[in-house]
Amino acid sequence: MDVQAAHEFGISIAQAARDLGAGIAVFALAGVGMGLGNIFSTLISSVARNPASRPHVFGIGMLGFALTEAVALFALLIAFLILFA
């Protein structure tokens, strides 16, 4: 194997590792989707059982949504940093 072929092979391995790392970083988005579904299904269920608790439960649900969505944005940021940095 000559030097040029070895260099190109090393670059292709690095590209594959970078793409694989970005794909693994995006796996967190599946957990975020399940978490958001769980938050809102529980919110709807609790308001259906006790409509008077809606103002208190809705605020907590929105806080849970924001924190869960922050994890998604962080995972997306890491994936973009892996791909383009």
From Swiss-Prot:
Localisation per UniProt entry: Cell inner membrane
Residues spanning the membrane: 20-40, 65-85
Positions of the record's site feature: Reversibly protonated during proton transport: 69
Keywords: ATP synthesis, Cell inner membrane, Cell membrane, CF(0), Hydrogen ion transport, Ion transport, Lipid-binding, Membrane, Transmembrane, Transmembrane helix, Transport
SS bond list: none
Function: F(1)F(0) ATP synthase produces ATP from ADP in the presence of a proton or sodium gradient. F-type ATPases consist of two structural domains, F(1) containing the extramembraneous catalytic core and F(0) containing the membrane proton channel, linked together by a central stalk and a peripheral stalk. During catalysis, ATP synthesis in the catalytic domain of F(1) is coupled via a rotary mechanism of the central stalk subunits to proton translocation.
Protein name: ATP synthase subunit c
Source organism per UniProt: Gluconobacter oxydans (strain 621H)
Gene: atpE
